[in-house]
Amino acid sequence: MAKKGFPGMGGAPNMNNMMKQVQKMQKDMEKTQAALEEKEVEASAGGGAITVKVSGKKEVISIEIKPEVVDPEDVEMLQDLIMAAVNEAMRGAEEMVSKEMGKVTGGMNIPGLF
């Protein structure tokens, strides 16, 4: 009588365990993603002149600009500061998401997951 399951996989009981592990990982990932949606990353540029908050969903939540940095004669500097703060906050959010999801996936990089 032939063994059930895939060749080299040790039969059906091991496949059942693998499926349970995958289902547990999926649930853990969903919980982690929900928790990440509630977290925020903050970054600033220009010595705190511009402050940006980004969510765990990698969406900009807020941008704060100190009035003293608003110079109609130098809009380009303000644009550069905003861009720097947004990019830094996005990098921070990406690192936070990768770290938290890495705990769930055991460090496996699953494309398109987060």
Curated annotation (Swiss-Prot):
GO annotation, cellular component aspect: bacterial nucleoid; cytosol
Region spans: Disordered: 23-42
Compartments where located: Cytoplasm, Nucleoid
Major location (coarse): cytoplasm
InterPro entries for the chain: YbaB-like_sf, YbaB/EbfC
Entry protein name: Nucleoid-associated protein Amet_4780
Main function: Binds to DNA and alters its conformation. May be involved in regulation of gene expression, nucleoid organization and DNA protection.
One GO MF term attached to the UniProt entry: DNA binding
Keywords for this protein: Cytoplasm, DNA-binding
Family that this chain belongs to: Belongs to the YbaB/EbfC family.
Organism the protein comes from: Alkaliphilus metalliredigens (strain QYMF)
Keyword Glycosyltransferase appears in the UniProt entry: no
